[in-house]
């Protein structure tokens, strides 16, 4: 390295991170490492049609009942919904329902979920090994040169693209349009899912593998309602949930969202104590 080549430390000193970014980073660490955060996920039990079944490590019997999960238990099982032990049959609304149901058992949080019409029960355990070994999220120093103003080009008709998920299965990913930005006179496009003024992107770049997890996620928003101005701040690129637990089923980037660009900003990987 030459005497004039900047190191990560000198770059960080030259471009101190805004307080809001530091606060965001602290909140991210706290969120994933919470007692029932992403690091605590120890199982996802998929449910098939048919008779109620026992799930590994859990009391009670579990089944599919239409678009809800049916739980059969007795008070001695100590499966609590809103602080009250389930006694008999209780129907549980999954995570995407307007009022999802959460079950607690011996400190663990049990969350019914639904993906493409298939129901499952997720188990979050505060004693998970991933929580015990967590050493913080590794991040690049803040880089103001990786903050872009983008324009949104909606598709004439939004579509669902079949993409590989972290568990090896393909599932549909709804895409509504492209976020378009430029760097060094090169135009880049990222297919995004739009919800109101928010745009969610799953992307890859040339740092994946050597320096970062296999892909990352980014949320962008319209700066001012009605302006159409969108800020893509790659300093807030974050690891997908499956970087913290193998039991998440995150979609990988859709075709076209692998950038021929080194995005040396944002989260890199999960830190682990030796």
What positions do the PLM features span?
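Actinobacteria-biased recognition of intrinsically disordered, low-complexity terminal regions
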Residues: 1-19, 23-26, 273-274
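Extracellular/luminal recognition modules and glycoprotein regions
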Residues: 27, 32-53, 57
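Forkhead-associated
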Residues: 47-94, 225
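Broad, structure-driven detector of short, well-ordered beta-strand segments within folded domains
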Residues: 59-67, 108-114, 188-192
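Acidic/His-leaning functional-site neighborhoods
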Residues: 180-226, 235
